[in-house]
Design a protein with these regions (language model features):
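N-terminal secretory signal peptides that target proteins for export/translocation
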Residues: 1-4
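Bacterial N-terminal signal peptides
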Residues: 7-19
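Asp/Glu-centered strand-loop micro-motifs enriched in Gly/Pro and often flanked by an aromatic residue
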Residues: 23, 134-168, 173-174, 196
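Sequence/structural segment immediately N-terminal to covalent heme-attachment motifs in c-type
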Residues: 23-41
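Extracytoplasmic electron-transfer domains, predominantly the class I c-type cytochrome c fold
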Residues: 37, 47-93, 342
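Short, solvent-exposed loop/turn elements at domain surfaces
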Residues: 46-47, 127-134, 158-164, 183
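Blade/loop signatures of beta-propeller domains
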Residues: 102-151, 305, 309-310
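Extracytoplasmic/lumenal domain signature
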Residues: 142-157, 182-202, 208-216, 220-250, ...
């Protein structure tokens, strides 16, 4: 008997192992069943190909199937099934989490007062969102720009899109990652001081401000699960977190803005993508602005930009319940007008018909109460979701998807008057009068416009001119840079897009190789910096638009932290200029754009 027991045990183990093996989900089969229709040729609009998805790690794909963009498709899959699909798509097994000890600094100098020296915080280098860095903070002249050289590079593991824009202050660079890691790097060398792990990817720029308890400074940011965070700027220690919207499609893409002890947060969504699944009950998300106590994270007020609560609104052609009104996501950071006691937000398209009156609008919302003071809808009737086939969720008369993705800019012109400058994916730009309920002062067309821009993520303004980069990512002639006179909207100059670097000598070009300028641009006195879809970081003369410096990111980089890294398209976030250095995030895996995973820093020898 003593001889038979091990044999029986071995048989049981083998049987159990065989049974488990038989039950292991087939990731390839699940992909073919659930995903191939959209992610293999001919595919659908905006869905990345399987090859493009291969740059993501399995964890990121599991997250997308659980509570991200593909949550509807993954809703009835088991955990092992989601993992099997993710491993198949990624082409690799689940790996370790990001190693934040790589490239660690040997010493940690005190942060001190990070706002006492040159800095860039938040999205637009200030609450007015001008994306103009004055000379005392830039410490870089037009004459010096041609001498910029690469000083350091940092690679981001398991990353295909460098969503976030850096914040630089007190000799530190703060940035969030696609995997939720928020890091503090040394701005001069690129070594890492500390890291903090958010619960989801961080797409926003980070805002920095003094703590109310006089214990240093705090960093504020949001993630793609609609959580807002406050952490200590010197240590990365968590101060508080707050979920500001419970809708499953909600996310935060615009940088929070700190003003007078309050943190103002805008909320966007991916529901227009979720609704591409015919089984999704469309649609119930509404864009909103939330005011939080910066010290505690407690909610002070919340304002949905569509006042009416979504409810049953008829049935689809298939007899399913339809809901509405919905949409008007706010993709960008709010703009503070302290003198008038309001903040300005730019809203996106509606998801349902009839399109809400506040979709595709510029809105003024009172800082103290959240009351809507006025709005100006610049594109009415724009009801849009991502449609495929005979999806009953699709609006009968779909709009052009011409949301506002860029923050409004509040500028005081050289004549002392204020102007609110806005740019839209339609390709139209406007000067609005903040004193007359946002009345239109001038219009200028910067590009033909499309669902991917037009003006996609951001423009720059000084006291005489506004500078607009044209995306045109899915138009025949993408790219181009315009300068217009602030007082009149008249064109001062137009710079033709240069030939794409990714299609240069010895290069094949191919998918995602074009001159689109979807990324936000940045101005300093005499210079405009632009990052292109072709992988080129360029500096232009603010007087003529002529290119005075170019850096080609289409290559692999030796990194401070040893993580393999390569350049690619620049999209969404823009260059940041502080204390004689230029910082840029490179890589953006989306429709018509190419992946990358590197943060680059340039300076003078």
């Amino acid at each position: 008997m003593t001889c038979r027991t091990p044999s029986l045990a071995l048989v049981l183990v083998l049987v159990a192992t065989a049974t488990l093996g038989a039950q292991t989900p087939d990731g390839a089969a699940l992909f073919e069943e659930r995903c191939a229709q959209c992610h293999t040729p001919p595919g659908v609009d905006r869905a990345p190909t399987l090859e493009a998805l291969r740059g993501r790690g399995p964890d990121a794909i599991v997250n997308a199937l659980t509570d991200g963009l593909m949550q509807v498709e993954g809703a009835d899959l088991t955990g092992p099934e989601r993992l099997a699909v993710a491993v198949f798509i990624a082409g690799t097994d689940r790996g370790d989490t990001t190693d934040t000890t790589l490239g660690a600094c040997e010493s940690a100098p005190a942060l001190g007062d990070p706002l006492a020296a040159p800095y860039w915080t938040g999205w637009g280098a200030g609450p007015r969102n001008l994306r103009f860095q004055p000379a005392e903070h830039a410490r870089l002249t037009a004459g010096q720009v041609p001498d910029l050289t690469l000083r350091w590079a940092v690679g981001f593991a398991d990353t295909t899109s460098m969503w976030a824009q850096p914040t630089v202050a007190g000799g530190h660079l703060f940035i969030g990652g696609q995997d939720g890691t928020v890091s503090a790097f040394d701005a001069a060398t690129g070594c890492r001081h500390w890291a903090y792990g958010a619960s989801a990817g961080v797409r926003t720029a980070i805002s920095l401000g003094a703590r109310s308890d006089d214990r240093g400074h705090a960093l504020f940011f949001g993630d793609v699960d609609a959580n807002v965070y406050a952490i200590d700027a010197a240590t990365g220690d968590e101060l508080w977190t707050r979920e500001v919207e419970t809708h499953p499609g909600a996310r935060i893409t615009g940088a929070p803005v700190l003003h007078d002890g309050r943190l103002y947060v805008t909320v966007s969504s991916l529901e227009e993508a979720l609704a591409s699944n015919p089984g999704y009950p469309c649609c119930t998300f509404r864009g909103s602005v939330v005011a939080l106590d910066a010290a505690t994270g407690d909610e002070i007020w919340k304002r949905y930009v569509i006042p009416e609560t979504p409810g049953p609104d008829g049935t689809t052609a298939d007899g399913d319940q339809r809901f509405g009104p919905a949409g008007a996501a706010i993709w960008s950071a709010p703009t503070v007008d302290a003198g008038r006691g309001v903040l300005y937000v730019a809203t996106g398209n509606a998801y349902t018909q009839p399109a809400a009156e506040t979709s595709d609008s510029i809105m003024a919302i009172e800082l103290t109460t959240g009351a809507i003071r006025w709005w100006n809808q610049l594109t009415p009737g724009d009801a849009f979701i991502i449609c495929r086939g005979n999806n009953p969720n699709c609006p009968e008369d779909a709009g052009p998807d011409h949301d506002f993705g860029a923050s409004p800019a509040l500028v005081t012109m050289s004549n002392g008057r204020d102007l609110l400058v806005v740019g839209q994916k339609s390709g139209m730009t406007y000067g609005l009068n903040p004193e007359s309920d946002g009345g239109v002062v001038w219009r200028y067309r910067a590009g033909p416009g499309s669902a991917l821009g037009g003006i996609e993520w951001g423009f720059a303004v000084d006291d005489e001119k506004a500078y607009f980069a044209n995306s045109g990512l899915i138009t025949p002639e993408p790219g181009g840079l315009s300068a217009v006179r602030l007082r009149t909207g008249e064109l001062v100059w137009y710079a033709e897009p240069p030939p794409p670097l990714c299609a240069g000598e010895g290069r094949s070009g191919g998918f995602g190789c074009n001159a689109a300028l979807a990324a936000a641009i940045t101005a300093i006195p005499g210079v405009i910096f632009s990052g292109s879809n072709d992988g080129g970081l360029r500096a232009h003369s603010a007087d003529t638009g002529a290119v005075i410096w170019t850096f080609d990111t289409n290559r692999e980089f030796e990194t401070v932290n040893g993580v393999p890294a390569s350049g690619g398209s620049m999209n969404a976030s823009g260059p940041v200029v502080v204390d004689g250095m230029v910082y840029v995030s490179v890589g953006y895996q989306f429709i018509g754009s190419r992946p990358g995973n590197v943060l680059l820093a340039f300076g003078l020898n």
